[in-house]
């Protein structure tokens, strides 16, 4: 008699939160087709690796994960290994040749066909590749299996990127920027709120470009004004806001709307005008400094995060010194520093005056030492203040301590708050008095639930 046991699927999603949303859509589609989802790869009949290929380290992490999980086909129940996302979109032929243990490759525009593709695979032993144009735009009618904790989720408001930064391969992998329809986003946010989500993290390659490809005048501000009206949503956080797209209207909305976190992630990449010009960034040093001054003036409690690149081709010691001085002066609450990754197919890859890996690493260390000191000082300034904190469970070190995040901390990238006194349930938002701090984390006591 034919077995009716459901096929089990496990997903490993690598890279950014935007990639995670793609993975969640694939899982939702498979769950709708009655596949059973498991977080244990050892139990899985089908394993999907959703990859990133943005920089060298991300590519290596993806390859390592693929090779590791390929072993499951030898020592476990896995019979189908799928590689999806940016890596196959970029390196289809090379991967198909070098990784015969992979059964299916799926690009960034074809993942919504995951169930159909698996059905096609059941009729052949051949390796299959589905790498089309990256033109898909997710909408709220597709099922999405939220893999984040129940109280927060990412809301991806657009696909692709139309910026042409000289170091970045994303436009080739994801296509031009396409805004999702306003009503579709509101509908998805309402669905998330109905499931208990309290925190929306707004993401795309550049959230300030939202609506620029629409003809009805829709903007990011238009969307935010709708989202704040949704019952149950208490925090709305803005990630990946390009500096040249931050309008006075957006600043005023962040300042005045209680549901919008006093938090802004602005990828600046550098401060030296010669480097910014080589990077093909649209903002110059003066514009960046004026924007930061305005943000600090209009929203004194704003937590600012940025990302910077060191070792870009042509970056001189003078350029790097300017960058160090800028970090000292700007006093970012959070800072990510990346060594420039020479990516084939980008204009920067063929630029002269490439910086050595040794110099890149040294510059990275110097900037991170500066930021650790500044972050410690910024956190010390919060001692004695009261912050809104979402409780996320027990500390990994001891069940005597709860942990959470303040509205000044984004998921996964910004540090945590350790709670030494008071009780609350996971997912509660509480008022917490800060009593101590470290370089990147805060410590405090619950005052009241909100």
Curated annotation (Swiss-Prot):
* Residues covered by the MTTase N-terminal domain: 7-123
This chain belongs to the protein called: Ribosomal protein uS12 methylthiotransferase RimO
Q: What job does the chain carry out?
A: Catalyzes the methylthiolation of an aspartic acid residue of ribosomal protein uS12.
> What are the record keywords, sorted?
4Fe-4S, Cytoplasm, Iron, Iron-sulfur, Metal-binding, S-adenosyl-L-methionine, Transferase
Instruction: List cofactor names only.
Output: [4Fe-4S] cluster
Which residues are listed for [4Fe-4S] cluster 1 binding in this entry?
Answer: 16, 52, 86
Give the location in the cell: Cytoplasm
Q: Where does [4Fe-4S] cluster 2 bind?
A: 161, 165, 168
Q: TRAM domain: which residues?
A: 380-448
Q: Where is the signal peptide?
A: none
What Enzyme Commission number(s) does the record list for this chain? Answer: 2.8.4.4
Q: Which SUPFAM superfamilies does this entry report, sorted A to Z?
A: Radical SAM enzymes
Where would I find the Radical SAM core domain in this sequence?
Answer: 147-377
Q: Which family does it belong to?
A: Belongs to the methylthiotransferase family. RimO subfamily.
Listed GO cellular component terms?
A: cytosol
The terms under GO molecular function for this entry are: 4 iron, 4 sulfur cluster binding; aspartic acid methylthiotransferase activity; metal ion binding; protein methylthiotransferase activity
**Which reaction is this enzyme known to catalyze?**
L-aspartate(89)-[ribosomal protein uS12]-hydrogen + (sulfur carrier)-SH + AH2 + 2 S-adenosyl-L-methionine = 3-methylsulfanyl-L-aspartate(89)-[ribosomal protein uS12]-hydrogen + (sulfur carrier)-H + 5'-deoxyadenosine + L-methionine + A + S-adenosyl-L-homocysteine + 2 H(+)
Name the domain of life. Answer: Bacteria
> Major place of localization?
cytoplasm
* GO biological process, alphabetically ordered: tRNA modification
